């Protein structure tokens, strides 16, 4: 049992300004406990703060600095809530057209962007009610040119189909929302010219206003339209001029009994050390952190692959919502932890580990209803600045993410080494489950020796974004291993619904003993990279093949051996339209087991590998010709008897032992996949 030099007690109801921190006279609030420790303890003393059940509402973020080190904040109860929300009261009825709305005053010093009713996130008004509008034209954008050739031709102005956009009241509060490529742009309207059907926005899009590879202009919708209020129950609108929230009640809701909460903070917890004096040994256990809002920030471009300007306000970060803040933020913090907590109803990421964050354990938490992603780790791009490493991100449930920023990732690790990312359950997101690395191409970087294992990642994408992976890797990462993960249900928009994605420059990575299935394009894709090892995996039922290759290079791109590859009417290893031909890619492939459950098995094929033409047939290539290239000369074609797990993970995975023995394949043991019970917990 750990002993502490100082022991304090906090209570929201029994505490008072005159409390001394004893169990009989607890302090009132977490800030009071922090300040009492600053005044009382001498250097080197450790402390524990027992926090009684109740609601602790913050008016400003709770901040910690180096002098607050060596402290454990322990929730003594099942419902210790730290909240940044304000409950709106005194609702009145307001008739609007044929509808009766409810109205309540909101804080005048906030631009309210989020509303939660009885603990559920409510949507702002939007147009159209169903589906999406489409950009009519963007000056200077030639759709006949390739999507990547024109990718960075962003704009703040575009033409629309007459009637799609109107001269709305509070026009500058209306936002154009554009999901395309792998991001979602958010562009507040500046002005509308109805005579020319042209709209100009206050921000510029990062990418050209096209629907990436589909050959069409981008889709979009409008959000926060006052004129749409009253059309759908449960929607709401913030009248910024009157500082009022207008809400359309759902059937059965009563003003006297429902609870509506608006966040008044963007962050709840800020743990900020200094580069030469970090916060150390600071721990939080058993809390629920809830209610933060989001804002349109100045977009940072530090991780952009180029062609963007720091002088322009853009509608999105270039990838993965990297500019979004965390409700709980750690910077220059070491040897600390967040354990057995809940983070919910937040506008950005749940947890951010920023520069100089090392040896932090984020374990056994539930992160849900997130505007952004679950955990975002960001270190310095070189070992000399802001190095972050050796963090433990395990046993977390990360669910319902990307509700504001759909390009956010379940667990994002940038410029960081030696991290353990394991036993997490990540699902119901719109973009990648886990993303790691973050140096484009073959440039030097600090990412290495990251272990990604025993994660259950499923039901992500939802057809919203393109170019995603259940596990996404970027850049040279020696020592990084992706193993024993269960990944399935990856659904992209136009292209790139992959279970494992080795993007630009991914090199010296081992992908082994994973079970990957049900991908809207392929189970594995290597854009380009060097000397990766893909072994002893199950890849099954990619809609457009099982493994996609994109770029031919002079070196060996990857080694593919002792894998089970099961398709349903499509070739296994594919390339072609818009990508390299499989014969042109230098790879080592052998001792694999191939089977097609619907058609003659084809080891390789060519054709369109994206999802824009699902009925277009991929052309099988001759197995003899494939083998003549030196590939799969000892591989086997035959029914593997594959059984995949059902929705409750029962009934699999398994393969025929006899078939597996022919190639030396050993079925991955995934019995421990997903979060484990905490020691001492049931």
Label every model-predicted segment.
Residues 60-61, 266, 293-299, 325, ...:
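Short glycine/acidic-rich loop motifs that flank beta-strands on beta-rich extracellular proteins
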Residues 59-72, 77, 508-651:
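Predominantly extracellular beta-rich ligand-binding scaffolds that present long acidic/polar faces
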Residues 50, 57, 63, 74, ...:
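Extracellular beta-strand solenoid repeats
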Residues 380-381:
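Asp-box/WD-like beta-propeller blade repeats and closely related beta-sheet repeat scaffolds
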Residues 205-215, 224, 251-277, 290-292, ...:
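Beta-propeller domains
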Residues 4, 45, 52, 58, ...:
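Repetitive beta-strand solenoid architecture
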Residues 4-5, 9-332, 337, 623, ...:
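Extracellular polysaccharide-degrading/modifying enzymes targeting complex plant/algal/animal polysaccharides
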Residues 280-291, 314, 334-348, 357-372, ...:
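Right-handed parallel beta-helix
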């Amino acid at each position: 049992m750990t002993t502490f030099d100082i022991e304090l007690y906090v209570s929201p109801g029994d505490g008072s300004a005159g409390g001394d921190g004893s169990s009989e006279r607890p302090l009132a609030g977490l800030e009071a406990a922090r300040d009492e420790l600053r005044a009382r303890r001498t250097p080197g003393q450790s402390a524990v703060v027992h926090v009684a059940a109740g609601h602790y509402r913050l008016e400003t973020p709770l901040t910690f600095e180096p002098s607050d080190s060596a402290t454990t904040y322990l929730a003594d109860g099942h419902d210790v809530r730290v909240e940044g929300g304000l409950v709106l009261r005194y609702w009145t009825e307001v008739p609007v057209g044929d509808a009766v709305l409810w109205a309540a005053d909101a804080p005048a010093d906030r631009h309210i962007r989020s509303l939660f009713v009885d603990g559920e996130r409510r949507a702002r008004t939007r147009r159209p009610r169903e589906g999406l509008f489409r950009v009519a034209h963007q000056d200077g954008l030639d759709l006949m040119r390739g999507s990547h050739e024109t990718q960075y031709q962003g704009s703040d102005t575009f033409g629309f189909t007459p009637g799609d956009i109107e001269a709305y009241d509070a026009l500058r509060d209306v936002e154009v929302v554009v999901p395309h490529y792998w991001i979602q742009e958010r562009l507040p309207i500046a002005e509308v010219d109805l005579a020319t059907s042209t709209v100009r926005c206050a921000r510029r899009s990062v990418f050209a206003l096209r629907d990436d590879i589909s050959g069409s202009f981008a889709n979009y919708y409008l959000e926060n339209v006052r004129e749409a209020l009253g059309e759908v129950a449960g929607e709401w609108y913030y009248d910024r001029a009157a500082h009022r929230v207008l809400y359309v009640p759902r059937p059965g809701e009563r003003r006297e009994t429902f609870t509506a909460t608006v966040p008044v903070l963007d962050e709840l917890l800020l743990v900020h050390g200094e580069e030469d004096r970090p916060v150390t040994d600071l721990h939080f256990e058993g809390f629920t952190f809830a209610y933060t809002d989001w804002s349109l920030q100045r977009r940072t471009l530090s991780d952009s692959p180029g062609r963007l300007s720091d002088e322009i306000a853009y509608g999105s970060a270039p990838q993965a919502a990297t500019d979004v803040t965390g409700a709980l933020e750690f910077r220059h913090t070491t040897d600390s932890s967040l354990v057995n907590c809940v983070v919910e109803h937040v506008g950005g990421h749940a947890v951010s580990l920023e520069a100089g964050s090392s040896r932090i354990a984020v374990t056994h938490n539930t992160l849900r209803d997130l505007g952004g992603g679950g955990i975002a780790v960001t270190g310095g791009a070189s070992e000399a600045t802001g190095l972050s490493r050796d963090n433990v991100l395990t046993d977390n449930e990360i669910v319902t993410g990307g509700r504001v920023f759909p390009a956010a990732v379940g667990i994002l690790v940038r410029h960081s080494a030696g991290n353990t990312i394991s036993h997490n359950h990540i699902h119901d997101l719109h973009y990648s489950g886990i993303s790691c690395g973050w140096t484009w191409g073959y440039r030097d970087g600090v990412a290495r020796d990251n272990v990604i294992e025993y994660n259950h990642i499923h039901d992500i994408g939802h057809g919203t974004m393109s170019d995603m992976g259940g596990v996404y890797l970027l850049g040279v990462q020696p020592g990084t291993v992706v193993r024993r993960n269960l990944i399935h249900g990856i659904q992209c928009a136009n292209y790139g619904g992959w279970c494992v994605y080795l993007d630009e420059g991914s090199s010296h990575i081992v992908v082994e003993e994973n079970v990957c299935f049900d991908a809207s394009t392929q189970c594995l894709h290597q854009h380009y990279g060097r000397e990766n090892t893909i072994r002893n995996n199950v890849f099954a039922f990619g809609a457009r093949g099982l493994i996609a290759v994109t770029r031919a290079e002079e070196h060996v791109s990857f080694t593919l051996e002792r894998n089970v590859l099961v398709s349903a009417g499509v070739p296994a290893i594919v390339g072609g339209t818009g990508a390299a031909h499989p014969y042109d890619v230098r790879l080592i492939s052998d001792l694999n087991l191939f089977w097609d459950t619907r058609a003659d098995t084809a080891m390789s094929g060519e054709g369109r590998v994206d999802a824009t033409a699902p009925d277009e047939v991929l052309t099988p290539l001759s197995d003899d010709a494939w083998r003549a290239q030196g590939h799969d000369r000892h591989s086997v074609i035959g029914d593997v008897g594959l059984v995949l797990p059902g929705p409750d993970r029962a009934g699999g995975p398994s393969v025929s032992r006899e078939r597996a023995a022919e190639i030396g394949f050993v079925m991955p043991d995934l019995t421990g996949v997903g979060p484990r019970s905490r020691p001492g917990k049931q």
